[in-house]
């Protein structure tokens, strides 16, 4: 077990009051076959990156109740294309959702792997590499267990010097450091060796583990440690206009140069606009985020050859065209925002669900 930093930030514990209120909204719907119109029994329906999910009933119906905020609702069924629907308190259908799933086109799947070779001993050759770039190399990652590595398939594209990893079923990861079991529907994992650039996308569903009182206390401390300075912590602080109190400092890259200039007022009308329950951030380019309330993990400093005396966590976001934040810390469009620096080092092993609250 990694050594814990023994601290509790009062501002952190009592921040984000809007999200901590017990306000919820319902989501009802039915999952059917797009071609026949027949209901699909047992379809997986969940809000990605949360602990909230269910299975459709015999008539295809489902019901969820969600805390106010934004979510990506994921609907999947074996042999069918997964569907994603963005929902929230202020943008959801007035009536019940009717989700029509299409059967997967096997010919398209075959075309995807054309020009590649499935590696027969893929796990032996690339397994640890995959874990390092998917789960991470943090101290918490050492306490994560991939329960079903047999569902992974590894493909190597010689002409492009690219590795692609597929999963034939949801990955199951037990995070013994944070006390979660994660079911992860892997959408894409690719790594380009020529540029040493990789990325992965997918849909995680969290299940809170049950443990002894000592385990529960340890998990609570570890979750707080992972949350402090995280992207989720930053996004919520930006939403709440509490960046300074929470220990965040922002700098924006000057266009055409690598120089950064401190953002003196992150809430000015040119950058920050509140509309009903949403906050729109109008930033393009690279935004550097420093977290001054907690030092980086020593393992990160050693791996990246930074001085061990470094006392500030430095991350950055490459932003295509701004983004919109909802009160639980969900934001969109997430595909247009890329992590750099400390946040990019903290991968799945540090991930917390949107329904996590520091005071829990």
Which sequence ranges carry the predicted segments?
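Bacterial Sec-dependent N-terminal signal peptides
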Residues: 1-28
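Short, ordered, surface-exposed loop/turn motifs in non-cytosolic proteins
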Residues: 25-27, 34-49
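A short, amphipathic beta-strand motif
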Residues: 27-33, 60-62, 99, 111
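Hydrophobic beta-strand segments
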Residues: 43-47, 73, 113
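A short, solvent-exposed loop/turn motif at the edges and junctions
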Residues: 47, 74-86
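Short, acidic Ser/Thr/Gly-rich low-complexity loop/linker segments typical of extracellular
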Residues: 50-61
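Structured interaction patches on ligand/partner-binding surfaces of diverse proteins
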Residues: 54, 81-97
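Surface-exposed, low-complexity/disordered segments
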Residues: 97-360
């Amino acid at each position: 077990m990694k050594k814990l930093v023994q601290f509790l930030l009062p501002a952190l514990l009592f921040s984000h009051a809007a999200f901590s209120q017990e306000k919820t909204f319902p989501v009802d719907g039915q999952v059917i076959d797009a071609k026949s119109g027949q209901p699909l029994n047992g379809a997986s329906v969940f809000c990605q990156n949360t602990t909230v999910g269910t299975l459709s009933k015999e008539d295809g119906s489902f019901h969820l109740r969600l805390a106010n905020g934004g979510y990506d609702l994921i609907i999947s069924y074996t042999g069918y294309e997964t569907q994603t629907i963005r929902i929230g308190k202020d943008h959801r259908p007035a009536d019940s959702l009717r989700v029509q799933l299409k059967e997967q086109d096997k010919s398209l799947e075959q075309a995807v792997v054309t020009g590649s070779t499935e590696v027969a001993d893929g796990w032996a050759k690339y397994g640890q590499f995959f874990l390092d770039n998917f789960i991470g190399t943090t101290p918490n990652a050492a306490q994560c267990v991939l329960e079903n590595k047999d569902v992974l398939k590894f493909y190597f594209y010689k002409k492009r010097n690219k590795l692609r990893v597929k999963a034939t079923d949801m990955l199951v990861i037990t995070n013994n450091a944070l006390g979660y079991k994660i079911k992860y529907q892997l959408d894409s994992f690719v790594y380009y060796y020529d540029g040493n650039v990789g990325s992965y996308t997918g849909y995680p569903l969290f299940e809170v583990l049950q443990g002894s009182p000592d385990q529960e206390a340890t998990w609570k401390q570890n979750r707080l440690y992972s949350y402090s300075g995280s992207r989720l912590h930053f996004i919520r602080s930006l939403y709440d206009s509490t960046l300074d109190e929470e220990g965040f400092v922002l700098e924006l890259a000057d266009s055409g140069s690598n120089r950064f200039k401190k953002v003196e007022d992150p809430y000015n009308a040119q950058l920050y606009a509140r509309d009903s329950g949403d906050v729109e951030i109008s930033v393009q380019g690279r935004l550097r985020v420093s977290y001054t309330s907690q030092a980086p993990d020593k393992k990160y400093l050693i791996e990246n050859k930074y001085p061990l005396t470094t006392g500030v966590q430095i991350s950055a976001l490459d932003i295509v065209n701004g983004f919109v934040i909802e009160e639980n810390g969900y934001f969109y469009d997430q595909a247009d925002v890329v992590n750099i620096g400390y946040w990019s080092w903290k991968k799945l092993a540090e991930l917390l669900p949107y329904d996590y609250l520091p005071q829990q």
